[in-house]
Amino acid sequence: MKAIVQDAYGSTDVLEFRDIDKPDMADDEVLVRVHAAGVDRGVWHVMAGLPYPIRLAGYGLRAPKNGVPGTDLAGVVEVVGKDVTRFQPGDEVFGVGTGSFAEYARAGDDKLALKPANLTFAQAAAVAISGSTALQALRDRGQVEPGQKVLIIGASGGVGTYAVQLAKVFGADVTAVCSTSKMDMVRSVGADHVIDYTRDDFVDRQQRWDVILDIGGNASLSRLRRALTPKGTLVIIGGETDGRWLGGSDRQIRALMLYPFVGQKLGTFVSSQNHQDLIVLKELIEAGKVIPAIDRTYPLNESPQGIQYVAEGTPEERSPSPSERESPIRVTISTDHTQQSRQK
């Protein structure tokens, strides 16, 4: 099969497009013929092996344990393991697997769900990780209730666009923080109020929020707390700095240390993808309450360009306002390697 392969950590220069064997699968796994794979900043971090704790988390100390990058996927079940009962060959599925930047990938049956009927494979490939992260952050960590005021920093990115829509599903009044060019898009997915971080500072407003979701930003913990109600909840998801050891996790560490001594709930979490939450997302998507936002699609052999695009963002996103730096909306990779040009 055709696949993107890396034998060492590094930049996109370490990625090669070549033929390899199809992956072996366990009894509780399925083999998926991948039609599209999703790209987010996590793909870049795993490719680069940065920050270093990623390597300690099981990805391989000196070189990647799994030579094919990618987890988000959408495709068709090719083969099922003997213990799999949820799926059968021919089912169209989405979720997460191992090595999705390839024509075939293996996936646990508890990490997949049937693809929403109203989505293309490219759209469905951008749901599992970003959608699950937003869902769990708001429902489980933020415990958002109807009528609460929710601030979403990084609202125009992959997780952010889902967070805006899901917060509205939960009945919240949503304020989104994004750049000038993304304001209309963020409004279109349901934001009640939009703050242009290039012109306005959310902390300087009189408004205080019950729940703040900071997605990949670098606003200081003290500034975030000033924008939070006295009993409010702050959920920090990621953070983008150049640190090789902590990356953007220093704020999360400080939040966890401070939390026992203040009235506000401060913290972070690590999302996980599971069949039950994928079903929740599937039902919301099919009901028209949540829609994936796709920026562009690259053919499989241009995966390095897609990863680089996500890592760098647009020129506006590289502007000197790192405290509210946006992640680009999800990029998907088409496994049809015969595709000659990317769609924009």
Q: What positions do the PLM features span?
A:
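A short acidic, Gly/Pro-enriched loop at the edge of an enzyme's catalytic core
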Residues: 203-211
